């Protein structure tokens, strides 16, 4: 039977410790400035993150103008637009404390309709748009995760230390070649269990089998230069995604990916025009789940143990039977 290592009150205190430490180090190591984040954007702007392209955003109209607005799914595109509007230069970046609602999320131990993450974005030069630069950025972020685990271990030694010294890198195609008989999700479990921490490179495009490792929207990540940070979760005994990130599309990549997905209508949106016409800066960015972080580092079995959200009654009852107490 699962037993949380902390009471609810102790957990709340530790959550603040996790978030404060990580935020400070993320800003320092990646040289990011914190900015205010929107909860909603106009529909016509094209600034909302449409995730895998099928999730429905929450829509409403504004009394004053009647304009259609959308609650954000993430700030993947808004951040790039903001960097341009605020006059940032190459090597400079921003981050936000992003809160979102994803109404169509499939609820389980690691997914909630409420999303909280550190959303960050940084301007890069054309020659930085390489796998090498992507990997160095991942290593920097992984270094912060390692320091966070060490920091928590000093305060709460019963949490233990599980992260390996280094994170390994593998492409989604190499992963398919390594485990051709497994589903993409089971491949993630296998590689994360073997290494403890892994970054899977290249998510969104079809593999040689004709299948995608996973879906990605066509208009923010360059599918050749993106990926996911996965850890092996000691309580769940499964792979566990901490961050999705990548070098963003330039005009060439956006043109190709919009054609592949049959989304040429997006070329008329202000955001997409800004990329196709080389007005918006080249960037790298990502989202780092705050509740996911807390769930991993505090060794929790359910995301509802580290965030307040709404859960169906049957799910709450099932959790109670497993000694999991949701906020």
Curated annotation (Swiss-Prot):
NCBIfam families hit by this protein: asnA
Reactions accelerated catalytically: L-aspartate + NH4(+) + ATP = L-asparagine + AMP + diphosphate + H(+)
Domain of life: Bacteria
Protein name (database record): Aspartate--ammonia ligase
Compartments (UniProt record): Cytoplasm
Keywords: Amino-acid biosynthesis, Asparagine biosynthesis, ATP-binding, Cytoplasm, Ligase, Nucleotide-binding
Protein species of origin: Bacillus mycoides (strain KBAB4) (Bacillus weihenstephanensis)
Single GO MF descriptor: ATP binding
Pfam families tied to this protein: AsnA
Record SUPFAM superfamilies: Class II aaRS and biotin synthetases
BP terms from Gene Ontology: L-asparagine biosynthetic process
Top enzyme class: ligase
Enzyme Commission number(s): 6.3.1.1
Family: Belongs to the class-II aminoacyl-tRNA synthetase family. AsnA subfamily.
Pathway: Amino-acid biosynthesis; L-asparagine biosynthesis; L-asparagine from L-aspartate (ammonia route): step 1/1
Record-level GO cellular component terms: cytosol
Record Gene3D superfamilies: Bira Bifunctional Protein, Domain 2
């Amino acid at each position: 039977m699962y037993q949380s290592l902390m009471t609810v009150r102790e957990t709340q205190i530790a959550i603040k410790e996790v978030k404060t430490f990580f935020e400070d180090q993320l800003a320092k190591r990646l040289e990011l400035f914190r900015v205010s984040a929107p909860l909603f954007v106009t529909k016509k702007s094209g600034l909302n993150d449409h995730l895998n392209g099928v999730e429905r955003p929450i829509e409403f109209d504004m009394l004053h103008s009647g304009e259609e607005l959308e609650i954000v799914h993430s700030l993947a595109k808004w951040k790039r637009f903001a960097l341009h509007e605020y006059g940032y230069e190459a090597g400079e970046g921003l981050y936000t404390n992003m809160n979102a609602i994803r109404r169509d999320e499939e609820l389980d131990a690691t997914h909630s309709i409420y999303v909280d993450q550190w959303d960050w974005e940084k301007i890069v030069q054309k020659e930085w748009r390489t796998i090498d630069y992507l990997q160095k950025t991942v290593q920097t972020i992984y270094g912060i995760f390692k320091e966070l685990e060490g920091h928590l271990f000093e305060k709460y030694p019963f949490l233990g230390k599980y992260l390996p010294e280094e994170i390994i890198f593998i492409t989604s195609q190499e992963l398919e070649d390594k485990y051709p008989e497994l589903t993409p999700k089971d491949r993630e479990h296998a590689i994360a269990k073997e290494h403890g921490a892994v970054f899977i490179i290249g998510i969104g495009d079809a593999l040689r089998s004709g299948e995608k490792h996973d879906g990605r929207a066509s208009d923010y990540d360059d599918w050749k230069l993106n990926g996911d940070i996965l850890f092996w979760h000691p309580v769940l005994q499964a792979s566990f995604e901490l961050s999705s990130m990548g070098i963003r599309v330039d005009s060439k990549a956006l043109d190709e990916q919009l054609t592949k997905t049959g989304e040429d209508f997006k070329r008329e949106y202000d955001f997409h025009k800004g990329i196709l016409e080389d007005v918006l800066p080249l960037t790298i960015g990502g989202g780092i789940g705050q509740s996911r972080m807390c769930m991993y580092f505090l060794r929790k079995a359910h995301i509802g143990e580290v965030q307040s959200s709404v859960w169906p009654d049957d799910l709450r009852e099932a959790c109670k039977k497993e000694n999991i107490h949701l906020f």
